[in-house]
């Protein structure tokens, strides 16, 4: 991977140094809107069994994404499904993050906002309620990840009127286990 002391750039994000198992989710089909700032943090998605949904391309010494979305494997028993996510801050400053979803009726994000210190990683769980709402899953759902610089206020106070420093959207996908 080159020099272990320097971060490795992948797409428009930066991967953390010395974390071989951290594979960034890569670019997404949902591009930023005009004027939105580039996302500077790294996101890693794992399914319920903690297996990464990204693969490493050893020939090019970089990570490439196999799946560029949050996938929920829906079961017949209609139990809620979770996806574990890790958010890494490769910058030199503490940042606050916020995760939004397209429907609070069918998704939950725990925690929806918080802080990530420089060179640290936080865990986030996204839940899909998995109820019989066929019209809900037929829509194009996505999760929006935002970050801004921290200034000492609480996360709620900070997000009440802060300027977004980076944006990234990942689409949701629903897979049947039939």
Swiss-Prot record:
Residues 52-177 form the MSP domain. Transmembrane segments: none annotated. It comes from the Eukaryota. It holds the Pfam family Motile_Sperm. InterPro entries: Ig-like_fold, MSP_dom, PapD-like_sf. This is Uncharacterized protein R05D3.5. It comes from Caenorhabditis elegans. The lineage of its organism: Eukaryota, Metazoa, Ecdysozoa, Nematoda, Chromadorea.
